[in-house]
Amino acid sequence: IEANDRYTACPFSNLVIGTDRPLAAQEFGLDGLKAAGVDVTIAKAIGVDPDTQSVTLEDGSRVSSDRLILSPGVDMRWNALEGYTQAAAEILPHAWKAGPQTALLRNKLVALEDGSPVVMTVPPAPYRCPPGPYERASMIAHYLKTNKPRSKLIVLDAKDQFSKMALFQEAWAEHYPDHLEWRGAIDDGAVARVDAALDAVYTDFDEITAPVINVIPPQKAGAIADAAGVTDLPGWCPIDPLTFESTLQAKIHVIGDATIAAPMPKSAFSANLQAKVCAFAVARLLSDLEPTPTTLANTCYSYTTPDEAISIAGVYTNEGGALASVSGAGGVSPLATDKSIRNAEAAQAVHWFDTITAEAFG
């Protein structure tokens, strides 16, 4: 059951914002799933009965199941950042769901007068794709350096540490010293409120106005997770990492960014692997077999220029009903390395994207 007949992928969407990559390269149809024998229903799910694992569709019809797997994605927590509403997002785009918001942010950059500032705000964790804001900052800085050389991006961050921080800062110092300024919480980077009518953001001690403001707001699990009763008070979904079954509702499984699966990050790689582990577990449960413990992994590629990328990887096991990082496994790209390594990782990112989308959509 999918609300849209075409899917717009978030991975690589930052390149749409900052390079000449077309938005169409992010779009995928569902015909491949149908050809593989999957019964695809294009409809919006608006309700879930957790007692029967049945789903109510927007037209009022219901779909029953023995076990239900939810992939809720994320929704923005409107007004968690004062002043940031759905209406405000049409002026200060978040672009944290790929599609029209991606195009809106790109178009605002294109229309920017050279010399005018750009602002990005980054929320506290957790949120979808931990290194995503910093890849986006890199791509926006690249766009400004190439097309609006008198403009600069100011990143206002609610944190003082972030994923692949040393690697990003090394790249920024090399490529964008005049086009990117990052301010952490200790430097008054945490944004307290925004005003879309004034194109303004406010920290504890500063007011900054800019014609282009990219607000990445606090997030939560998508609305269908609330309807199913699988969210906790912070708005995310606790799960059993052996099966990804909700710990709040029996026979309902949750995968992807909506889950509480730390230290496994909210990433596309994680979601894809969680889906496979969950499907395997559900198949065994439906056959009255015990689920088999598995090892999970994650890799996140991030572009720092259109042809250079960095990565972080992790491996995770189930220990006492919670995921734990495997000591000595995974790692990050090396600092101060040859450009050919960064080029190779950029090529690997393309291969990963092509593989994961082929797996998902055929």
Predicted regions and their residues:
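Beta1-alpha1 glycine-rich phosphate/pyrophosphate-binding loop at the start
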Residues: 1-39, 124-165
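Short glycine-rich anion-binding loops that position phosphate/pyrophosphate groups of nucleotides
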Residues: 6, 73-76, 219-221
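A Rossmann-like FAD-binding core segment of flavoenzymes
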Residues: 36-56, 63, 141-235, 290-291
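FAD-binding core/adjacent interface of flavoenzyme oxidoreductases
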Residues: 40-135, 142-146, 214
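FAD-site-proximal beta/loop scaffold in flavoenzymes
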Residues: 85-114, 208-273, 284
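FAD-binding beta-loop-beta segment adjacent to the flavin cofactor pocket
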Residues: 235-253, 305-324
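A conserved FAD-binding loop/helix module that cradles the flavin
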Residues: 256-304, 313
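C-terminal auxiliary extensions adjacent to catalytic cores
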Residues: 311-362
